[in-house]
Amino acid sequence: MAIPAPAAEALVERLFDATVDALELFSIHLGTRLGLYGALRDAGPLDAAGLAARAGIHERYAREWLEQQSVAGLLAVEDDLAAPAERRYSLPPEHAGVLAEPDDPDHVAPFATMLAGIGGVLPALAEAYRSGGGVPYARYGADFRHGQGGINRPAFRHDLPSVWLAAMPDVQARLDDASRPARVADVGCGHGWAAVAVAQAHPAARVDGIDLDRASIEDAREHAAAAGVADRVAFFEDDATGSAGRGPYDLVLVLEVLHDLARPVEALAAIRAALAPGGSVLIADERVADAFAAPGDSVERMMYGWSVLHCLPTQMAESSSAALGTVLRADTVRELAEAAGFGEPEVLPIENDLFRFYRLRA
């Protein structure tokens, strides 16, 4: 049956708007990577020559980028009737957190950097879809790695200690007990922001970060050193099962990781074995719908987007993978936990648009 004309027209309009949005996201990536937003935040308003000099880019490119950003409504221009070389642009204060402040709760510019990383592996993705193979995480490169670390950084540094752990008062009390320093593991630690945050918020605790990606571990060590907690935070290049040999742990963090594990039951069983008596596991994973339904809301659409372009391919790159994809529903978390020997997961009453939180007990 032919698609009714109005429906086709609506789809054309939707894809046109998506193309505009995609182009603007890639321009945001350039602004982030080249330090253009930071230059405007620190020294604006600037004309093209001023931005070029401060950021070390060519003046002609600076002018075009500034014009594009102002047309997109991301930057403000003092006088759009001025000659092109004389126009001065600024980063509005209300946009600075979104685009130029890595610790701001509204900082979502790293999404653009993640998409740039995906762009670099599209040919490999097409081949993986044909062959049934995968695309290893490292293949996505520094852009995706830094984007992923950056998008998680504000929540891990601020919400984790002040909101997420606060939902488990007994765990917070254990972390603050200086008479018996607590041990914490951050499984799939990535850039180490969660490990750093726990160490900063709880000076008596010692934290081990574990991740398979060597480049991420190197980044995490730099972040811990810069934060002044390297004496209490250690990072290890290992998979999730490596936690079993480094315990016992009073708390294990599995933040935005469970859906990415190739062998999640094996990993959770190792984590269970690594828990100290009375220990807990905090899982944060996607707040997707309880069951598949189409069309879905924006969160469901985003998670399926990450799944087809990143999460599933990285999982398929590992042997004997469960190939969960990104869309990890609550019933699946329950099944995985019970298969690993845990009891019923407790869903914590934490309000969050993207994550659902589960507590597992020893």
Residue spans for each PLM region:
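Conserved adenosyl
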Residues: 119-259, 264-266
